[in-house]
Curated annotation (Swiss-Prot):
Chain positions of cross-link Glycyl lysine isopeptide (Lys-Gly) (interchain with G-Cter in SUMO2): 317
Pfam families: Ets (PF00178), ETS_PEA3_N (PF04621)
Name of the molecule in the record: ETS translocation variant 1
Location of the region described as Disordered in the Swiss-Prot/TrEMBL record: 128-178
PROSITE patterns in UniProt: ETS_DOMAIN_1 (PS00345), ETS_DOMAIN_2 (PS00346), ETS_DOMAIN_3 (PS50061)
Residue ranges flagged as DNA-binding region: 335-415
Gene: ETV1
GO molecular function terms listed in the Swiss-Prot or TrEMBL record: DNA-binding transcription factor activity, RNA polymerase II-specific; sequence-specific DNA binding
CC terms in the record's Gene Ontology section: nucleus
Organism expressing this protein natively: Bos taurus
């Protein structure tokens, strides 16, 4: 048996043993028939019509009839479980280098249908790049043919009873038109049904044993990870096309998988720098995309504007406090109209235009226009009048803070408790210092240059002797 590498010896031995032991072991014969029947039934279920598929494979792959007798079942099993024997590699034309060159040259070409993952390798090893016909007959030793190609059911009798036959596996899925390039067929079983032995779930795809890829053919010398990553990385695909026959010097799979990671990491770093390392990230990454730079710019200036307007708003709101030392809520501009009225009523000096009537919380606007004018000064609204002030007071009617006394003009009253009123009007017992007429004149300091100009015009006749001095502003010293 050592001198034979095909299926003739298993047939002869099996037939002779049947001739001698048919009467001695009827149980084994029935068992083998049951196994063969089961395997044939499973094969028909998986491949629908085994003979029709075999004729289709042979017709499309242009394989001679004498090539389908040189890959026995026990050899495929020994390749799967005991490693590749060296006798298969002793052949005149090794398909290894031709296969590598074919993969690198036909890489961008894609199939239009997915059944070609089951084709014979010899049909592609020795064919032109465009045509599908082989230029010369393939080498018999390098022609792997599936055991299922044989139409005779005796081929299944040679298998062991406990053999893990691939008939229980589902059929191969068709390859989509735009999913994989043509060399993806070499990642599958070329002449066997796809994935005769399923890969381990815990083992990575690039680290699985090579016999799972092709059982009756020498190993493909380049890593399968390259085929897995080519259609994801167009740059790497272009480099493989240019490589040609030198595709055996592929970079390690780690480098192939690292390229998209570097690109993704480079695209993520600018955003991190724009968030956590503002100025450094903006300066040390001049090659970032325009979107990241645009994101960095508005973020930086937005932070500046967030700080500066707060200061400006604080200064504007603190404008009453520039002339006095008042409470904090007054500087924030939170003084409301009812609080302003309570502050005016609490100051006895304002009794000539607003005062308590002595009937509970009632008060009267003795000079309503003066009250409106002071409220306009407080809110920096020079056009404030009593009509606008009265409309503002109606808002407090709905809120239940104050009411209009019926039958009396300019008389109002607070409807809440006096202690609660003053505690809310003066938090922390801080009386707001209101603006007065003097403060109103101070607020008109914008006209100071005009007054100086008038004074300088008045002193111009007296300063006639000072004409030689080159003072363009007209100041006289």
């Amino acid at each position: 048996m050592d001198g034979f590498y095909d299926q003739q010896v298993p047939y002869m031995v099996t037939n002779n043993q049947r001739g001698r032991n048919c009467n001695e072991k009827p149980t084994n014969v029935r068992k083998r028939k049951f196994i063969n029947r089961d395997l044939a039934h499973d094969s028909e279920e998986l491949f629908q019509d085994l003979s029709q598929l075999q004729e289709t494979w042979l017709a499309e792959a242009q394989v001679p009839d004498n090539d389908e007798q040189f890959v026995p079942d026990y050899q495929a099993e020994s390749l799967a479980f005991h490693g590749l024997p060296l006798k298969i590699k002793k052949e005149p034309h090794s398909p290894c280098s031709e296969l590598g060159s074919a993969c690198s040259q036909e890489q961008p070409f894609k199939f239009s249908y997915g059944e070609k993952c089951l084709y014979n390798v010899s049909a592609y090893d020795q064919k032109p790049q465009v045509g599908m016909r082989p230029s010369n007959p393939p080498t018999p030793s390098s022609t792997p043919v599936s055991p299922l190609h044989h139409a005779s059911p005796n081929s299944a009798h040679t298998s062991k009873p406990d053999r893990a036959f691939p008939a229980h596996l589902p059929p191969s899925q068709p390859i989509q038109d735009s999913s994989y390039p043509m060399d993806h067929r070499f990642r599958r079983q070329l002449s066997e049904p796809c994935n005769s032995f399923p890969p381990l779930p815990t083992m990575p795809r690039e680290g699985r044993p090579m016999y799972q890829r092709q059982m009756s053919e020498p190993n493909i010398p380049f890593p399968p990870q390259g085929f897995k990553q080519e259609y994801h990385d167009p740059v790497y695909e272009h480099n493989t096309m240019v490589g040609g026959a030198a595709s055996q010097s592929f970079p390690p799979p780690l480098m192939i998988k690292q390229e998209p990671r570097d690109f993704a990491y480079d695209s993520e770093v600018p955003s991190c720098h724009s968030i956590y390392m503002r100025q450094e990230g903006f300066l040390t990454h001049p090659s970032r995309t325009e979107g990241c730079m645009f994101e960095k710019g508005p973020r930086q200036f937005y932070d500046d504007t967030c700080v500066v307007p707060e200061k400006f708003d604080g200064d504007i709101k603190q404008e009453p406090g520039m002339y006095r030392e008042g409470p904090t809520y007054q500087r924030r501009g939170s003084l409301q109209l009812w609080q302003f009225l309570v502050a005016l009523l609490d100051d006895p000096s304002n009794s000539h235009f607003i005062a308590w009537t002595g009937r509970g919380m009632e008060f009267k606007l003795i000079e309503p226009e003066e009250v409106a004018r002071r409220w306009g000064i407080q809110k920096n609204r020079p056009a404030m009048n009593y009509d606008k002030l009265s409309r503002s007071l109606r808002y407090y009617y709905e809120k239940g803070i104050m009411q209009k006394v019926a039958g009396e003009r300019y008389v109002y009253k607070f409807v809440c408790d006096p202690e609660a009123l003053f505690s809310m009007a003066f938090p922390d017992n801080q009386r707001p210092l209101l603006k007065t007429d003097m403060e109103r004149h101070i607020n008109e300091e914008d006209t100071v240059p005009l007054s100086h100009f008038d004074e300088s015009m008045a002193y111009m006749p007296e300063g006639g002797c000072c004409n030689p001095h080159p003072y363009n502003e007209g100041y006289v010293y």
